[in-house]
């Protein structure tokens, strides 16, 4: 391993010990905000410190085994050669782990996220599929103990959704769900199809990190056009009495956000502004990412949200993840929320791309 990497790891080890000492300080314990921040930092350092300690131990084992080679005893020499082989193999594995653990992390990976699902080509069948995707993500969120809150929903005429926007809150939400952005295609026989022909429909999924208020882009109120209207859908008689739904248009960018899920106009406005801030930030991030990747296309984290990323083929029970040429015949499990079988390989591919970019740099 390079000396520069070893020095960085030693610095992280020292910082880990500092943080551990601070966490037992009475003043820090009394300051809940600082205690939480340090606890989070300690948790983030834990894996890399554990791997680095194991790496150091393997180095010591290798040195001891090499000393043993100088012995005259033939059995000891044989044992030493075996231990050297094991120690070198362990060092190779740990070096790979440490390289991945030291990769630059997207600071937004720990953020909550807005998940948008929109029906595309395919009419009613696309809306029904959007409903199926929403159910799939709901199951995945339940498995991860994440909270889902519907911000806006426009239901399809025959089920599902023309569009649905939800906020997902929890640990590491954006870091996992960001890989879902893109075009999702379904191939299946609709219930209304009497000939048994397979139809193809599509939905677009967009995942954006929630931007904390302190970090949010300043939005000039003069750049906003705000309309109120009566909410449609669930809500009983209430929906006919008050203009509680909100539509906000950001004039410079043309971005439009609607929120009508809350009964209070004030709450709908707050939610709409939160989604608007995330969308504007996403556009800014997209511009920057495009500039950074002008010389190198990132296979997995491609910003092209219209790009087809996945196909769900119901007759064959198959899911195809096009970005990494992954095919799984586990469609029913995936639709029930078992997304880690896809997200795990996507994350690994992303890490490999980052490592390649670092080595090129």
Curated annotation (Swiss-Prot):
SMART domains listed in its UniProt record: PCRF (SM00937)
Membrane-spanning ranges: none
GO molecular function per UniProt: translation release factor activity, codon specific
Disulfide bonds: none
Domain of life: Bacteria
Modified residues (N5-methylglutamine): 237
Bias-annotated ranges (Basic and acidic residues): 284-296
UniProt record similarity statement: Belongs to the prokaryotic/mitochondrial release factor family.
Name of the featured protein: Peptide chain release factor 1
Organism encoding this protein: Shewanella loihica (strain ATCC BAA-1088 / PV-4)
């Amino acid at each position: 391993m390079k000396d520069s990497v070893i020095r960085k790891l030693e610095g992280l080890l020292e910082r880990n010990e500092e943080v551990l000492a601070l966490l037992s300080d009475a003043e820090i314990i009394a300051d809940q905000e600082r205690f939480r921040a340090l606890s989070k930092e300690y948790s983030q350092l834990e894996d890399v410190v554990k791997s680095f300690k194991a790496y150091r131990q393997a180095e010591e084992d290798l040195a001891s085994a090499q000393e043993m080679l100088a012995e005259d005893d033939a059995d000891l020499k044989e044992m030493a050669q075996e231990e050297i082989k094991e120690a070198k193999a362990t060092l190779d594995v740990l070096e790979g782990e440490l390289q991945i653990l030291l990769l630059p992390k997207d600071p937004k990976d720990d953020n909550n996220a807005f998940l948008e699902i929109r029906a595309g080509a395919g009419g009613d069948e696309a809306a029904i599929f959007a409903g199926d995707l929403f159910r799939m993500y709901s199951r995945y969120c339940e498995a991860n103990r994440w909270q889902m809150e519907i911000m806006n929903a426009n239901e399809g005429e025959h089920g599902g959704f023309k569009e649905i926007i939800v906020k997902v809150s929890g640990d590491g939400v954006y870091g996992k769900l960001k890989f879902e952005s893109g075009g999702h295609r379904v191939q299946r026989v609709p219930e209304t199809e009497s000939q048994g022909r397979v139809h193809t429909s599509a939905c677009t999924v967009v995942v954006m990190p929630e931007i904390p208020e302190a970090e949010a882009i300043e939005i000039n109120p003069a750049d906003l056009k705000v309309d109120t209207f009566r909410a449609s859908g669930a809500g009983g008689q209430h929906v006919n009495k008050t203009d509680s739904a909100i539509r906000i248009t950001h004039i410079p960018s043309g971005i439009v956000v609607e929120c009508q899920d809350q009964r209070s106009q004030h709450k709908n406005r707050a939610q709409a502004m939160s989604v608007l801030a995330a969308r504007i930030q996403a556009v800014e991030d997209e511009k920057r990412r495009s500039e950074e990747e002008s010389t190198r296309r990132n296979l997995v984290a491609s910003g092209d949200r219209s790009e087809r990323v996945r196909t769900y083929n119901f007759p064959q029970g198959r899911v195809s993840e096009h970005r990494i040429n992954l095919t799984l015949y586990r469609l029913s499990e995936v639709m029930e929320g078992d997304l880690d079988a896809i997200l795990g390989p996507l994350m690994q591919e992303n890490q490999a791309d980052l490592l390649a970019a670092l080595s090129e740099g």
